[in-house]
Amino acid sequence: MKSTLMTASLLILVVLFIIDYASVYAEFIDGEISLERERDIPCFETCMKLYHIPKLCYIKCRKH
């Protein structure tokens, strides 16, 4: 009985660790996407002033 209880407790701890890691990683990815968008906005605006072609500017600025 103690062995089953210990195994269940360990399994719960592992699941909680995985969930915590996933949430931290998701926040990191969300932050990276926000930073990428902030960098793309000035690029896109400058490109539009020069070329006036939204599709070209979108492709050009996404490569940075």
Swiss-Prot record:
Position of the signal peptide: 1-26
Highest taxon above the source species: Eukaryota
Propeptide residues according to the Swiss-Prot or TrEMBL record: 27-38
Protein's cellular compartments: Secreted
GO molecular function, one term: toxin activity
One annotated Gene Ontology cellular component of this protein: extracellular region
Claim: Signal is one of the keywords in the record: yes
Primary localisation category: secreted
Tissue: Expressed by the venom gland.
Alphabetized UniProt keyword annotations: Disulfide bond, Ion channel impairing toxin, Neurotoxin, Potassium channel impairing toxin, Secreted, Signal, Toxin, Voltage-gated potassium channel impairing toxin
Disulfide links within the chain: C43-C61, C47-C57
Family as reported in the entry's similarity comment: Belongs to the short scorpion toxin superfamily. Potassium channel inhibitor kappa-KTx family. Kappa-KTx 4 subfamily.
Task of the protein: Potassium channel inhibitor (Kv).
Record comment regarding domains: Has the structural arrangement of two alpha-helices stabilized by disulfide bonds (CSalpha/alpha 2(S-S)).
Protein known as: Potassium channel toxin kappa-KTx 4.1
Organism: Heterometrus petersii (Asian forest scorpion)
